[in-house]
């Protein structure tokens, strides 16, 4: 049986499963779910084997909110001996396909993490054997070298069990298990800074940073205190207006790049139409935040927005779907072209991060 394996944050398997099942049904592909609760793994077992690769070709991973990474299985669970595991894996895999990279992966729980050292040690002889068999290309260390290639995934359930599969380099995360490993900057006043750092890395292509994430831009941070998100803007050389009734970190104020206005983020409106970035991590009802973000963009108060929508305890997938639809409806009402993506990022917890921008002129922009 062919399955699609999806990685997500532990505790969000139901949301991840509901989403892939819904998106597959939209493409007339069906199957049933197997959820590995609190392991961050979802198995979507397809009724038709050909639908695994077909769905991966049709559905962009970036359109899935809760899935960090995914792959299509090419083997069932393989039992590994205590000796010569490499030979067992290469025999099960065969040599019909060629892959541009290898990902050694495991569940995102304590049992899975205990396998990380084992996987690192095994990856070296496994790569060598796969190259020798011409299953892994000689480069075989970076999927960016072959964006049209396939990635080989080895999901270790234990030291004695593995599932093999593939993803498409152009439609999968470049990170093992979809997890970027970011270092917390000691100069930041809050760990929330990693959320925005990851968001920029995830949503904005690196070859567009010089145009969209560059020094000299004006930015607004709603709900800014103590300055975790402001820090990411400042370190990129932007001039920031920080809006929050709380105090900002003195280290940020001393840069000369931050103006702090003590007021409600829902009431602030910029006097000039020269703001490029709006960022927002307010602990507020997601419906209110979604409405506010669409208003800022439609009125031309900013060019791009990066914001978090807090998730409820129950009905999380439905709630975030409704909030995104609110934004889409507002844009559609004014007949504008737009870009809107949401992702439950690694450094997010009970929230999802959303990126939005208009691709046509802001219809409600005031004439200067």
UniProtKB/Swiss-Prot annotation:
Active-site residues annotated for this sequence: 310
One GO location term (cellular component): cytoplasm
Reaction catalysed by this enzyme: cytidine(2498) in 23S rRNA + S-adenosyl-L-methionine = 2'-O-methylcytidine(2498) in 23S rRNA + S-adenosyl-L-homocysteine + H(+)
SUPFAM superfamilies found in the cross-reference section: S-adenosyl-L-methionine-dependent methyltransferases
Keyword Transferase applies: yes
PANTHER family with a match to the protein in the record: RIBOSOMAL RNA LARGE SUBUNIT METHYLTRANSFERASE M, RIBOSOMAL RNA METHYLTRANSFERASE FTSJ DOMAIN-CONTAINING PROTEIN
Name by which UniProt lists this protein: Ribosomal RNA large subunit methyltransferase M
Assembly, per entry: Monomer.
Chain's role: Catalyzes the 2'-O-methylation at nucleotide C2498 in 23S rRNA.
Pfam family, one: RLMM_N
Binding site for S-adenosyl-L-methionine: 192, 225-228, 244, 264, 281
Keywords: Cytoplasm, Methyltransferase, rRNA processing, S-adenosyl-L-methionine, Transferase
Protein location: Cytoplasm
One GO biological process term: methylation
Upper lineage: Bacteria, Pseudomonadati, Pseudomonadota, Gammaproteobacteria, Alteromonadales
Coiled coil: none
UniProt xrefs under HAMAP family: 23SrRNA_methyltr_M (MF_01551)
Keyword Aminoacyl-tRNA synthetase applies: no
Enzyme class, broadest EC rank: transferase
């Amino acid at each position: 049986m062919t399955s699609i394996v999806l990685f997500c944050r532990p505790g969000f398997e139901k949301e991840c499963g509901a989403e892939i099942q819904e998106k597959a049904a939209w493409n007339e592909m069906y199957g049933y779910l197997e959820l590995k609760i609190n392991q961050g793994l979802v198995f979507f077992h397809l009724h038709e084997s050909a639908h695994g690769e077909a769905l991966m070709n049709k559905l962009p991973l970036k359109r899935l909110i809760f899935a960090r990474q995914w792959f299509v299985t090419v083997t069932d669970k393989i039992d590994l001996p205590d000796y010569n595991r490499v030979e067992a894996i290469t025999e099960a895999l065969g040599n019909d396909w060629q892959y541009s990279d290898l990902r050694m992966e495991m569940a995102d729980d304590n049992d899975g993490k205990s396998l990380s050292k084992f996987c690192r040690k095994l990856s070296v002889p496994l790569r060598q054997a796969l190259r020798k068999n011409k299953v892994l290309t000689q480069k075989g260390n970076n999927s960016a070298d072959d964006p049209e290639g396939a990635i080989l995934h080895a999901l270790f359930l234990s030291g004695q069990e593995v599932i093999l599969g593939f993803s498409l380099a152009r439609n999968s995360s470049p990170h093992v298990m979809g997890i970027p490993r970011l270092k917390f900057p000691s100069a930041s006043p809050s760990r929330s800074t990693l959320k925005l750092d990851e968001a920029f890395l995830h949503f904005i292509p690196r070859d567009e940073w010089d145009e969209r994430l560059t020094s000299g831009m004006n930015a607004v941070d709603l709900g800014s205190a103590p300055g975790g998100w402001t820090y990411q803007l400042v370190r990129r050389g932007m001039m920031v207006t920080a809006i929050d009734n709380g105090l900002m970190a003195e280290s940020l104020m001393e840069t000369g790049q931050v103006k702090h206005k003590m007021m409600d983020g829902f009431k602030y409106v910029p006097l000039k139409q020269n703001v490029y970035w709006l960022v927002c991590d307010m602990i507020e009802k997601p419906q209110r935040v979604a409405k506010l973000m669409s208003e800022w963009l439609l009125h031309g108060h900013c060019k791009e927005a990066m914001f978090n929508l807090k998730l409820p305890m129950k009905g999380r997938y439905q709630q975030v779907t409704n909030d995104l639809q609110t934004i889409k409806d507002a844009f559609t009402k004014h007949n504008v072209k737009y870009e809107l993506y949401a992702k439950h990022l690694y450094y997010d917890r009970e929230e999802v991060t959303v990126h939005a921008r208009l691709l046509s002129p802001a219809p409600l922009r005031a004439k200067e």
